[in-house]
């Protein structure tokens, strides 16, 4: 039983929630849904919420939530430990959260290696966008990897467990036949069931299984809470896939076709959820690409509900979208040029975003009363030169002049903030085939950028961590041996820099041997 302070903290979180499911523990088959990060981050994830609702809609299944906030881990709804559940399913959205999968198992008292777990332990399943990109780092620790959209995979997976409960080998054998699903090599060896062929430390990753049509099930937040990144907001998924093919992005090259939810269904979802909140967030890889986005904005204007967007491609944003955003009380706009120079933007697949288009969007945002701007840029892009890096502060200086002119009617100059990241090549994307910049060159470019940004007035920024980018690169590109890197990080208490140093030392010794 968790201590008093933990029970109080959990109760406060639950009392702040609106919506959701409460079933008595022990009344059904049980699935513990684990988001390997904090409650604040996990409950901001729409995919996590969709899975939670889908499982609970099966009358003979109970789904409860786990996060990393509590030690030892406990289910939010029943306070049960992870070992009490039939299945533990991890939803991983960020590569660095693979570390938290390992740490969660250790803190739960569950043998972290699949080969060491017998049938008395929960079945450990992993899904999420990260296993689409690269499941290799996590294979040593889980039994089953599901590379499929939840509404496609869950009915069959839960049915098979119901049919074979008590016979781990039979369940894994049957699950291995499902499209997009595979038993990891250590679990396959332990239970003598079919698993993927391992060659040179790698396994063939099945293509993601997708739902051919959207709209049959609600793709919305079903638990609303102030304790998320999007406080008291219902997220609404407009589309999946992406109509663009940016050369650095996994989605447009691997998760298509682009599928949209019809306008009338979106209207129904929003109307039904007005009892929970007046705030709605539209989610898609490219919100402005929905063919009826302007009509949807007009509908929200009629209802007088507040709207925000998960991503805004400056190439396609419309005036109606900006007007709806301003009417909703937004004071800031976020766009992602990704590079300061048009040469690099063209390389990234953003040839439709010249400076003129970017300035048009910003000018209209200022005119509509949104004085604050946030820009996303990457450093370390293949072929990047010092001139490309210097193009970022130069672009900001020009923006500052626009800010001064555009802010006069409002009596104050807005703020300009940057989100800077180090480019990490993603497998199965065109830029992954380019020769990466040497680490020392990236470090030099970051130093140049920091010096120049400090000379630009009224700009807020924080330099990205090169160490975290290197760790992410190992996990995004690594083979089955990258599980050793996660173990090093765990041995160093989550210190990625220390893990990188030891990883490099091990690699150097291997070369010398």
For each feature predicted by the language model, list its residue ranges.
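Short secondary-structure boundary/capping segments
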Residues: 48-50, 140-142, 161-162, 253, ...
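N-terminal [4Fe-4S]-dependent radical SAM core
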Residues: 3-32, 39-40, 186-235
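Radical SAM enzyme core and accessory elements
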Residues: 1-20, 27, 31-33, 446, ...
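Short helix-loop-beta junction
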Residues: 50-62, 301-302
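Conserved SAM/AdoMet-binding glycine-rich loop
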Residues: 33-34, 38, 96, 267-374, ...
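Canonical Radical SAM [4Fe-4S] cluster-binding loop centered on the CxxxCxxC motif
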Residues: 45, 227-263
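Flexible glycine/acidic-rich beta-alpha junction loops that bind and position SAM and/or redox cofactors
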Residues: 188-190, 244, 291-293, 320-321, ...
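Glycine-rich beta-alpha loop elements in corrinoid/cobalamin-binding modules
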Residues: 68-197, 427-479, 487-498
């Amino acid at each position: 039983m968790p201590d008093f302070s933990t029970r109080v903290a959990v109760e406060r979180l639950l009392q702040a929630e609106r919506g959701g499911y409460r079933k008595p523990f022990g009344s059904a088959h049980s699935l513990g849904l684990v988001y390997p990060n904090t409650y604040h981050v996990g409950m901001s994830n729409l995919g996590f919420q969709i899975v939670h609702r889908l499982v609970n809609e099966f009358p003979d299944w109970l789904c409860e939530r786990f996060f990393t906030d509590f030690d030892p881990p406990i289910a939010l709804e029943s306070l049960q430990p992870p070992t009490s559940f039939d299945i533990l399913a991890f939803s991983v959205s960020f590569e660095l959260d693979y570390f938290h999968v390992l740490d969660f198992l250790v803190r739960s008292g569950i043998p972290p290696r699949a080969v060491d777990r017998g049938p008395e332990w929960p079945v450990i399943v992993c899904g999420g966008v990260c296993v689409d990109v690269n499941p290799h780092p996590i294979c040593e620790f889980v039994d089953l990897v599901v590379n499929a959209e939840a509404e496609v995979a869950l009915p069959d997976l839960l049915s098979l467990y119901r049919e074979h409960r008590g016979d781990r080998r039979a369940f894994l054998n049957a699950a291995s036949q499902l499209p997009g699903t595979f038993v990891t090599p250590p679990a396959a060896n332990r239970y003598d069931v079919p698993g993927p062929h391992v060659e040179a430390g790698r396994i063939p990753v099945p293509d993601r299984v997708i739902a051919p049509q959207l709209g049959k099930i609600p793709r919305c937040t079903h638990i609303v809470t102030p304790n998320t990144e999007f406080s008291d907001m219902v997220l609404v998924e407009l589309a999946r896939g992406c109509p663009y093919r940016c050369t650095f992005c996994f989605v447009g090259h691997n998760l298509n076709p682009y599928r949209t939810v019809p306008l009338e269904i979106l209207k129904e979802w929003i109307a039904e959820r007005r009892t929970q909140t007046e705030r709605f967030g539209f989610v898609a890889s490219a919100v402005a690409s929905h063919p009826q986005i302007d009509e949807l904005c007009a509908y929200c204007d009629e209802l007088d509900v507040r709207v925000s967007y998960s991503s805004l491609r400056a190439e396609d944003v419309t005036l109606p979208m900006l007007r709806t955003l301003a009417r909703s009380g937004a004071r800031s706009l976020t766009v992602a040029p990704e590079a300061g120079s048009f040469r690099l933007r063209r390389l990234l697949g953003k040839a439709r975003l010249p400076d003129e288009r970017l300035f048009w969007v910003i000018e209209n945002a200022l005119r509509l009363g949104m004085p604050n701007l946030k820009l996303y840029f990457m450093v370390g892009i293949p072929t990047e030169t010092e001139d490309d890096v210097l193009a970022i502060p130069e672009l900001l200086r020009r923006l500052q002049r626009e800010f001064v002119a555009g802010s006069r009617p409002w009596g104050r100059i807005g703020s300009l903030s940057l989100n800077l990241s180090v480019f990490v090549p993603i497998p199965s994307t065109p830029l992954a085939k380019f020769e990466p910049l040497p680490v020392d060159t990236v470090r030099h470019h970051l130093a140049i950028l920091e010096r120049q940004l400090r000379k630009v007035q009224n700009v807020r920024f924080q330099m990205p961590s090169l160490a975290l980018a290197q760790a992410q690169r190992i996990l995004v590109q690594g083979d089955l041996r990258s599980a050793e890197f996660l173990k090093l990080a765990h041995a160093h208490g989550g210190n990625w820099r220390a893990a990188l140093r030891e990883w490099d030392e091990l690699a150097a010794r291997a070369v010398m041997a």
